[in-house]
């Protein structure tokens, strides 16, 4: 007995776990439970397993809570700092609590080091019995009360049990980093969530529904392995990738058919319909010029069928279009000879210009003043055609630069891959810029000579003429040799001067003051005006009218 108690005390001193001390305090607070536990352990003989038949009441089972450090110590038996025999002795010593002296029977005089493995086996047998007993203890009313110290100790011990169980399940760093560095993620065979390893950002909602169905089926049947699931998922992903590749190929083929996006596609479609059908509301010749020619058709993505249609119409339009007469003007204005000539070259349009001028000279002039001579094929003409033919007649081979789209007209004709009408527009712009100073006075309002001449002359003419006239009337009235003529002239000049002064009073005072100073400085002009006024009345009236 003394040896067992000393060994238990020494082993308990070796265990640094505070839950055993906490359990002793809680057990000391309930002495009848401790006595009952001691009697139960004594009745159990050499194993201390007699707690199982003493499970009649909840109070008698309280000391079994000391088995939690035993589980912790079992998890740490393989630690290098503690030998397995000492760990087993420590676990046995910390198990019964205050009734440890009564635990071993007096008929076993074995030393503690030898008795520890013998007692460990029946305790291992009694371990599965603790789980139903713990359920019974959790159903007891004393455990449910939150204020009791027993409940607090149980909470701490249950947390320790959870942490110890999770510590057992985790694998070492070598098992994790080894396959991870080789490119293989470690898989847990017991958990059925490898389907969740997909990223939902790359999946569609239909795939999410399939994943949910897979999860449910895998949870019900545990015979499914993770390898089968991964194979199915890989097959599904391959199918999805093939579908996406096919759709992307279709879209790329569509884009190859029309590499120039935007309005070029619509222009080509409208040209096709306009060339095939007679009622076409287009009346602008600048829209279909670009893509009618043979070589740029391949550049702009028009199919060879449309190209054949254009070529057939170019060949047979001169025969068909002459008997046709369309009064509504709904036909697309596409002259056949111009289209056939524009298909011959990419870089320059000089042959088309020559052919167009020759064809315009060969055609008979139209009756209507708004139609050019080329409108015999039944197509209505636009103002651009009219201006184009006027420029042809005047000797310039260019329409107006209304549609010149290049920002640098001097350099854009160097690009050989541009559409042919771009080259024509560049030429038009250069020639119009060179001819602009000749025809500028017809269109522009102010001239540089006139602008410089206005402040010195025309705007201030009446003010300068009124300056010498104001003192001239006084001189005429004072120094008049003939009274009759002077009175008539005086009445005429005073009336005219009063009307003139009333007109100039609305102007600036500075101008009148300047005119007065000018009249004082120029007396010779006053004498000349006196002679003119005395000479002839109508001459003075004409002078005022001219001013």
UniProtKB/Swiss-Prot annotation:
Record flagged with keyword Protein biosynthesis: no
A Pfam cross-reference name: FAM117
One GO cellular component term noted in the UniProt record for this chain: cytoplasm
Phosphothreonine found at: 110, 175, 177, 266, 343, 350
Compositional bias annotation for Basic and acidic residues: 130-145, 187-201, 319-331
UniProt keyword annotation of Transcription present: no
Keywords, in A-Z order: Coiled coil, Phosphoprotein
Biased composition (Gly residues): 39-50
Disordered: region residues: 1-55, 72-285, 319-417, 505-530
Phosphoserine found at: 20, 79, 105, 107-108, 171-172, 223, 258, 303, 345, 394, 398, 406, 412, 480
Compositional bias of kind Polar residues: 265-276, 339-356, 505-520
Coiled coil (UniProt feature): 225-254
Low complexity bias: start-end ranges: 1-13, 26-38, 86-105, 162-177, 236-245, 357-369, 521-530
Summary of the tissues where the protein is detected: Predominantly expressed in lung, spleen, thymus and testis and, at lower levels, in brain, bone marrow, peripheral leukocytes, skin and trachea.
PANTHER family in the record: AGAP011572-PA (PTHR14972), GLUCOCORTICOID-INDUCED TRANSCRIPT 1 PROTEIN (PTHR14972:SF3)
The protein, known as: Glucocorticoid-induced transcript 1 protein
């Amino acid at each position: 007995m003394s040896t067992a108690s000393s060994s238990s005390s020494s082993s308990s001193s070796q265990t640094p776990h505070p839950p055993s001390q906490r359990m002793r305090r809680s057990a000391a607070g309930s002495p009848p439970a401790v006595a009952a536990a001691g009697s139960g352990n004594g009745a159990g003989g050499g194993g201390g397993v007699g707690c199982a038949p003493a499970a009649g009441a909840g109070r008698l089972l309280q000391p079994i809570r000391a088995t939690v450090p035993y589980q912790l110590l079992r998890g740490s038996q393989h630690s290098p700092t503690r030998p397995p025999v000492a760990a087993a002795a420590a676990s046995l010593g910390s198990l019964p609590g205050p009734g440890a002296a009564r635990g071993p029977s007096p008929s076993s005089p074995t030393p503690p080091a030898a008795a520890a493995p013998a007692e460990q086996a029946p305790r291992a047998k009694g371990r599965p019995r603790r789980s139903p007993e713990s359920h019974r203890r959790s159903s007891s009313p004393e455990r449910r009360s939150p204020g009791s110290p027993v409940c607090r100790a149980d909470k701490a011990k249950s947390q320790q049990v959870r942490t110890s169980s999770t510590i057992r399940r985790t694998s070492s760093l070598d098992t994790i980093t080894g396959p991870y560095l080789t490119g293989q993620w470690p898989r847990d065979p017991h958990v059925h969530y490898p389907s969740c390893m997909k990223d939902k950002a790359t999946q569609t909602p239909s795939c999410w529904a399939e994943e949910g169905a897979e999860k449910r089926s895998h949870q019900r049947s545990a015979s499914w392995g993770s390898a089968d699931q991964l194979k199915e998922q890989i097959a599904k992903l391959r199918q999805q990738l093939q579908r996406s590749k096919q759709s992307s190929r279709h879209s790329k083929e569509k884009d190859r058919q029309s590499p120039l996006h935007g309005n070029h596609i619509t222009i080509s479609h409208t040209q096709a319909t306009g060339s095939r059908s007679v009622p076409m509301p287009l009346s602008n010749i600048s829209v279909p010029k670009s893509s009618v020619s043979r070589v740029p058709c391949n550049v702009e993505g028009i199919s060879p069928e449309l190209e054949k249609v254009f070529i057939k119409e170019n060949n047979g339009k001169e025969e068909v279009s002459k008997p046709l007469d369309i009064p509504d003007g709904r036909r697309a204005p596409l002259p056949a000879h111009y289209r056939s000539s524009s298909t011959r070259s990419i870089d320059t349009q000089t042959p088309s210009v020559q052919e167009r001028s020759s064809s315009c000279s060969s055609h008979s002039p139209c009756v209507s003043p708004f139609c050019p001579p080329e409108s015999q094929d039944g197509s209505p003409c636009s103002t651009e055609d009219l201006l184009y033919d006027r420029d042809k007649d005047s000797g310039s081979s260019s329409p107006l630069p209304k549609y010149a789209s290049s920002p640098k007209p001097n350099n854009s004709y160097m690009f050989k891959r541009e559409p042919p009408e771009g080259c024509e527009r560049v030429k038009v712009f250069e020639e119009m810029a060179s001819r602009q100073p000749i025809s500028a006075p017809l269109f522009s309002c102010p001239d540089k000579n006139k602008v410089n001449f206005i402040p010195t002359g025309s705007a201030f003419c009446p003010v300068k003429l009124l300056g010498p006239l104001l003192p001239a009337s006084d001189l005429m009235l004072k120094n008049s040799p003939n009274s009759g003529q002077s009175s008539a002239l005086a009445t005429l000049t005073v009336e005219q001067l009063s009307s003139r002064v009333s007109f100039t009073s609305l102007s600036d005072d500075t101008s009148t003051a300047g005119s007065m100073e000018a009249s004082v400085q120029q007396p010779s002009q006053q004498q000349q005006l006196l002679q003119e006024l005395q000479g002839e009345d109508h001459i003075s009236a004409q002078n005022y009218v001219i001013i």
